[in-house]
Structure formats: C-alpha cells, structure tokens
C-alpha cells in the first residue's frame, strides 16, 4: 500500500504540471522498452525445444473455433482493450487538439488553402492509423504467443495477489533468475504508462463532458482547471479501488468487456460523422467507405455477442 500511495502522489504531481510532450515521451519510452524485451524473449524462446511454438500450433490458433466457457468472455474482453480499444478511440481527438493539429488546419471555410490543409491532416491521420495498427498488432501477437507458450502449457492462471508474479514466469525460460527483475521493470513500464496516460486522458474527457452537459462554461481556463482537478481526483479514486478491491484481473476483464460494448456505439458515431458531418471535399473513397462499414459490422458482432453471453 505504501508503494501504491507513493506512485499515486508522484503521478498527481506529474499530471498536474505536465503537458502533452511529457506524457507522450514518458509513456512511449516505457511501453517500447518492455515490448522490445518481450519480442526478444519470444525470439530466443524458439531455440528451446520444450517451449518452441510450432507452425501446427499457430495454424490451430488461427482456426475458426469458438472457445467454450470463460474463454470467449476473456477473448471479447481482450477485444475491448487490446490494440486501440474503446477508450483510446474516444480519447484520441483530445490529444490531437492538445497537440495543436486542429489549430493548424484552422476553421472550415471555402478556400482551396483550407481544403489543402485539411487533406494534409487527413493523410497524417491515415498514416498514424496504419502505423499504429502495425505496431500494436505485432506487439499483441508477441504477448499472446508468449502467454500461450508458457502459461498455456504449464496451466498457470494469473489472478489475485499473485498475478504479476505468475505473469513473470513467461520470462524465466530465457532470462532465468533475472526474469523476476526484468518482468518487474516491464510490469511497471506497461502498467504505470497505462495508468499515467489513461488518467490524463480520462481527465480531459471528464472535463469536456462537464462542458457538453452544461455544468461548466466553454471557457478554456475553466476547462484546464477541471482537467487538473480530475488529474488529482482520479488517481485517488484508483488508489481507493486498489485498497478495497483485491481481484485486479476481474477489474481488467470487466473494463475490457465494457469496452467491447462501447465499440458499436463508436461505430454508429463514425457513420454519423461520415454521412452527416463530413465536408464533401474531404469525403473518402468508396474503398474507405466499404472498410468503414465492415469495421462497424465487426464491432456490432463483438459487442452484440458480448451482451448475449452476459445475459444468457
């Protein structure tokens, strides 16, 4: 509890005084470091016959087989939080605004200069989306394969107070006695960066929600004040949940499950903006529209099935 309190207090200070660049640089360094260690671990694991992942096992994993029992619930929960989940899709525009991209594009008008700036910004978004997809797909595959190779074969189930220690077993075959230290660093990197960025993002969403619902005015100074207040209150709320709720993996699954339910709503919002709010000069091609509809359909399948399995 002492360490949790210390981390909370340090985070509050960093979040209150920090800006986009600090949050971006810290989180990028932490996550990239541990992801690289994990991929190196997976690579060297293939040299150990008892832990090597075969092509047959990969083919079985890619087969169209729906797991029974809690396996499907876990898969749907993971769908809601891995890669770019519901919360990231909601929070992404706030970081774009804080970075200043929208200010560079400027208010919409009929000039060809504005059209050129807007199209340039959309190209940046597309590159960002494609590069992000490549990065998080390979990173996610690395963690999935590592978990299947070690935890799946040994029957270890991370949960309760031993969750971090159990997950650390994935690094023992390659790193030996140093695995615990390496994973402690990695766990801190990933978990703290998630805590750090999520808190900063939720603070901005909550502060903006107060403006949307008319609780506060649209004044930028008032908005910034509320962002700082939420940067103080949210970490304290998280600390309280840690103190009184002793099953962290259940919170992770519950959050992922709710994220899977929110994804269809975001799909509808995307369709609304595409067909009701999009400037005709910036309309995407038919191929992009087809991709959008396929994505929305996939979000509805995942979200609908999540609701069905929970109710039935």
Residue map of PLM features:
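Membrane-interface loop-to-helix entry segments
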Residues: 6, 10, 14-45, 256-263, ...
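Extracellular/periplasmic helix-exit of transmembrane alpha-helices
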Residues: 96-97, 102-104, 134-165
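Loop-to-transmembrane helix boundary motifs in multi-pass membrane proteins
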Residues: 1-5, 178, 210-244, 292
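C-terminal membrane-solvent junction of multi-pass transporters and transport-like membrane proteins
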Residues: 26-29, 208, 214, 218-229, ...
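Helix-loop-helix connectors at the membrane interface of multi-pass transporters/channels
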Residues: 1-2, 97-103, 109-110, 199-226
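Selective recognition of specific alpha-helical transmembrane segments in multi-pass small-molecule
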Residues: 84, 114-151
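Hydrophobic alpha-helical segments and their helix-loop junctions in multi-pass secondary transporters
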Residues: 32-70, 75-78, 82-94, 267-279, ...
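Membrane-helix boundary/coupling elements in multi-pass transport proteins
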Residues: 81-89, 140-143, 180-211
């Amino acid at each position: 509890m002492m360490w949790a309190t210390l981390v909370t207090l340090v985070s509050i200070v960093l979040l209150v005084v920090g800006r986009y660049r600090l949050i971006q640089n810290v989180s990028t360094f932490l996550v990239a470091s541990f992801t690289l260690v994990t991929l190196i671990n997976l690579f060297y694991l293939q040299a150990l016959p008892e832990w090597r992942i075969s092509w047959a096992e990969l083919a079985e994993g890619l087969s169209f087989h729906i797991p029974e029992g809690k396996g499907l619930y876990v898969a749907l929960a993971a769908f809601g939080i891995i890669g770019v989940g519901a919360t990231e899709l909601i929070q992404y525009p706030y970081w774009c605004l804080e970075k200043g991209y929208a200010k560079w594009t400027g208010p919409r008008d009929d000039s060809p200069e504005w059209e050129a700036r807007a199209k340039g910004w959309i190209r940046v978004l597309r590159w960002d989306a494609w590069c992000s997809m490549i990065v998080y797909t390979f990173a996610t595959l690395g963690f999935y394969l590592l978990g299947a190779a070690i935890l799946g074969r040994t029957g270890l189930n991370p949960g309760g107070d031993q969750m971090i220690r159990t997950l650390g077993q994935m690094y023992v075959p390659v790193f030996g006695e140093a695995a615990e230290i390496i994973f402690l660093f990695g766990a801190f990197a990933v978990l703290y960066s998630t805590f750090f960025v999520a808190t900063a993002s939720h603070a901005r969403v909550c502060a903006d929600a107060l403006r949307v619902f008319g609780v506060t005015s649209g004044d930028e100074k008032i908005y910034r004040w509320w962002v700082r207040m939420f940067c103080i209150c949210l970490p304290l709320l998280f600390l309280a949940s840690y103190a009184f709720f002793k099953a962290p993996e259940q919170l992770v699954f519950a959050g992922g499950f709710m994220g899977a339910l929110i994804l269809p709503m975001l799909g509808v919002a995307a369709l609304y903006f595409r067909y009701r709010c999009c400037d005709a000069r910036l309309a995407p091609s038919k191929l992009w529209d087809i991709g959008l509809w396929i994505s929305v359909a996939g979000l509805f399948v995942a979200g609908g099935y999540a609701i069905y399995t929970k109710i039935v």
